[in-house]
């Protein structure tokens, strides 16, 4: 996908006297210095809905990560491996990103897509996540694309009705199965986690006997490596009843 902001270029090719050339050169150097200072200080242009666009309640950021199977990953190397795709603030901006992204079912190897509220990194150790947890569901191969789309559309549409509790969602593509999860801020709030569970069942049209696992990020941090929920054992790999024309 092309960058949302094109670089500004000065393509003037006419004759200038020496003073104008020096002035232009100085202006260019000043702009470069100002730009470098802005980048080094971490300043970014705020993402806002465009004219006539439909704003979301929160801004969200897409992330992507991929790792080598069987190789333990530290928090530092995991953070370096995860790549930010882009941030959006409206329905229209979301579809501009999503329509250009590979669907989870077409990913290979140990790959993950993450969709989190802007400012929250998809890491257990992030301040917004460290006291929270996630609902985890394992999927048979071939179901991840539809379930992922249903999940993130429900999240963007505020269907979970739990205020600011939702942090984000993850789809993890593995060799024999895929995993989806939704993260919330407060693992100790049983009423909130129960509401998230019930909404997740509804938006994914899960059968009543579907096995769902809630795992706190504190427990995930204690486990060696970055495998987290993939190490949990599930008896049923469910197949949802999808209403397909």
Swiss-Prot record:
Name the Gene Ontology biological process terms: in utero embryonic development; miRNA-mediated gene silencing by inhibition of translation; negative regulation of translation
Superkingdom of origin organism: Eukaryota
Which residue ranges are recorded for the region named Disordered? 1-52
Q: Which stretches does the entry tag as region EIF4EBP1/2/3 binding?
A: 54-57, 95-99, 150-157
Instruction: Indicate, by first and last residue, each region the UniProt record lists as having compositional bias (Basic and acidic residues).
Output: 1-38
Family matches, as PROSITE patterns = IF4E (PS00813)
Glycyl lysine isopeptide (Lys-Gly) (interchain with G-Cter in ISG15): where is this cross-link? 134, 222
Keyword flag Glycoprotein:
no
Which residues take part in binding mRNA?
78-79, 110, 124-125, 174-179, 222-224
Q: Which residues carry this modification: Phosphoserine?
A: 13
GO molecular function terms here? Answer: RNA binding; translation initiation factor activity
User: What happens when the protein's gene is inactivated?
Assistant: Lethality; mice die just before birth.
Claim: Transcription regulation is one of the keywords in the record: no
- Fill in the subunit field for this protein: Interacts with EIF4EBP1, EIF4EBP2 and EIF4EBP3. Does not interact with eIF4G (EIF4G1, EIF4G2 or EIF4G3). Component of the 4EHP-GYF2 complex, at least composed of EIF4E2, GIGYF2 and ZNF598. Interacts with GIGYF2 (via the 4EHP-binding motif); the interaction is direct. Interacts with EIF4ENIF1/4E-T (via YXXXXLphi motif); increasing affinity for the 7-methylguanosine-containing mRNA cap.
Similarity comment text for this entry: Belongs to the eukaryotic initiation factor 4E family.
| Role summary | Recognizes and binds the 7-methylguanosine-containing mRNA cap during an early step in the initiation. Acts as a repressor of translation initiation. In contrast to EIF4E, it is unable to bind eIF4G (EIF4G1, EIF4G2 or EIF4G3), suggesting that it acts by competing with EIF4E and block assembly of eIF4F at the cap. In P-bodies, component of a complex that promotes miRNA-mediated translational repression. Involved in virus-induced host response by mediating miRNA MIR34A-induced translational silencing which controls IFNB1 production by a negative feedback mechanism.
Q: What is this protein called?
A: Eukaryotic translation initiation factor 4E type 2
Q: Which gene encodes it?
A: Eif4e2
